[in-house]
Structure formats: C-alpha cells, structure tokens
C-alpha cells in the first residue's frame, strides 16, 4: 500500500547517564529543522506515548504544527492514550486527531474516533484510500449522510458498543470535562509521587511525564511482565521496548490510570497501588 512511501522517525533520547536515565522527546528545534528540510506531507506524533509514559506538551505540538504548515503539510496526533488530557485542536494547530473509546473514555473498544480540522476536511476529498476498512473519506461520507437525515452503509457497525460509548461520553460531559481533566492530573501526580518515594524511577523526563500512563524502571522480571501485580489483584501492563536505541538491559513496567472509576476515586486508586508495593 505504500503507506507511506517514505518515512523519517525522530527518536526520543536519554537526558542523563546510567541505565535508568530518563527519556525526553527529540528536541523541538531538531524536529522543526527536519520538517523544513524534508517537507513531509504528514507529520504523525503521539500525544501520549505508552511505552515511555511520555507526553508532548502543547507548546511542542504547536511548534510541530506550525513547521509542517509552513511546508504545506498537515499534522496528525494520536490521542488514544491521552486519557482526560484534552487537546485543543485549534490552539495546537492539529489537523487530524485520532483517538479510541477504551482508555480515557471508559468505553468498549469498537471504533476509531477521528477529528478533522477545516483544512483536513477539505484535503480529504482529494484523496483515494488503498484500504476498504480504513477508508476515512468513505466513513466521512457515511457520517455526513446520517447527519443530513439519510442512511448509508459501508460495513456492519458495532452498534451496542457505540451506544455505550455515547452514554459514557455524555456521562463525562455532564460530570465536567475540566473537572475530570483535573482529576487525571492529580491522580497521575499522586501515583508518580508514590513510585518516586519508593525509589522507583520514571522513564519519562521532567516536563514530559504523562499523568495517564506511568512507566517506571524495574530490574525485576516478575514486575516487568506484570505477574507480581496480578498475584495481588492488580492489572498492570508489561514493559515494552522503546525502540529508541535503549540499552539491552532496559526493563520497565506500565500503569494505566484510565477510566472514570479511577479518576473519581484517586485516594482509593493510590492506596491500592501503595498496598501492592508494600506487599
């Protein structure tokens, strides 16, 4: 499918010495210079990257978007793991935002959720997809048919899961988007403080620590593969490679702080983790 025909990866890098040094995104000056030199049609970035627990701040996103717009391209932001750290597309310059139901929205995994800027909506009409299931222009036509009061069919939809997603999105809206964002920030800070107080070091460097995905170093394979937490009734995610030229002995474990239950009950969420660490 030649998706894409060519690609350049701007890797994160360590910001210190030692085998448990923290990691930060590629310096923004280097990213901007590469965009201006290579003139890509699209720049993809993860808002929150889940192997490292790293978040790209709004000013970083804005600088990337401005640079790619200068050369006639567009910016695509992966927000699947953003949790309740909402992204303002207009303020950051993001053209295409992609997310999903199953993390911050507390929904069932059933679809992709795609938001388009005015420029992206205009550009998509001139594209042809090489995929049937992932033909974004076709799905856009389906959506716009329904919005106009009509009916159209492309593939069978996971209707029940979509209805559940709609319900939980309405629940979050009624509770307050800003309120739940503040809960996400507070819970992430509390969990990171808990880990650091026990000498557990963060993979993400200061200034780039995501509040919804906390990735920390370990030297214990039973923590890395989540078996020790599972034995205590907690589900964590196994650590995975960064694929950024990390040392051979790189080992981590991941804690996802997603879902309204965790966010609305931060004290309980932190206490459960603390009890597991003390066991």
Where are these regions (language model features)?
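Short beta-strand segments
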Residues: 2-4, 44-46, 76, 99-100, ...
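Conserved active-site and cofactor/substrate-binding residues in soluble primary-metabolism enzymes
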Residues: 26, 30, 59, 63, ...
């Amino acid at each position: 499918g030649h998706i894409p025909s060519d690609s350049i990866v701007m890797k994160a890098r360590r910001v210190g010495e030692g085998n448990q040094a923290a990691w930060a995104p590629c310096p923004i000056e280097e990213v901007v210079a590469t965009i201006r030199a290579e003139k890509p049609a699209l720049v993809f970035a993860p808002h929150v990257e889940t192997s490292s627990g790293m978040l790209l701040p709004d000013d970083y996103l804005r600088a990337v978007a401005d640079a790619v717009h200068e050369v006639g391209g567009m910016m695509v932001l992966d927000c699947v793991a953003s949790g309740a750290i909402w992204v303002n597309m207009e303020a950051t310059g993001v053209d295409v935002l992609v997310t999903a139901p199953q993390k911050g929205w507390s929904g069932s995994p059933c679809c992709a959720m795609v938001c388009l800027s005015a420029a992206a909506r205009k550009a998509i009409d001139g594209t042809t997809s090489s995929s049937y299931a992932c033909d974004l222009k076709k799905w856009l036509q389906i959506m716009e048919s329904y919005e106009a009061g009509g009916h159209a069919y492309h593939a069978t939809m996971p209707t029940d899961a979509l209805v559940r997603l709609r319900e939980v999105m309405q629940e979050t809206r009624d509770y307050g988007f800003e309120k739940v964002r503040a809960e996400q920030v507070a819970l992430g800070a509390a969990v990171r403080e808990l880990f650091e107080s026990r000498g557990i070091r963060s993979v993400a460097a200061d200034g780039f620590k995501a509040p919804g995905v906390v990735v920390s170093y370990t030297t214990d394979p039973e923590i890395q593969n989540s078996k020790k937490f599972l034995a205590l009734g907690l589900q964590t995610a196994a650590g995975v490679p960064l694929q950024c030229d990390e040392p051979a002995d790189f080992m981590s474990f991941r804690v996802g702080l997603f879902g309204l239950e965790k966010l609305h009950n931060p004290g309980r969420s932190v206490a459960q983790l603390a009890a597991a660490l003390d066991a």
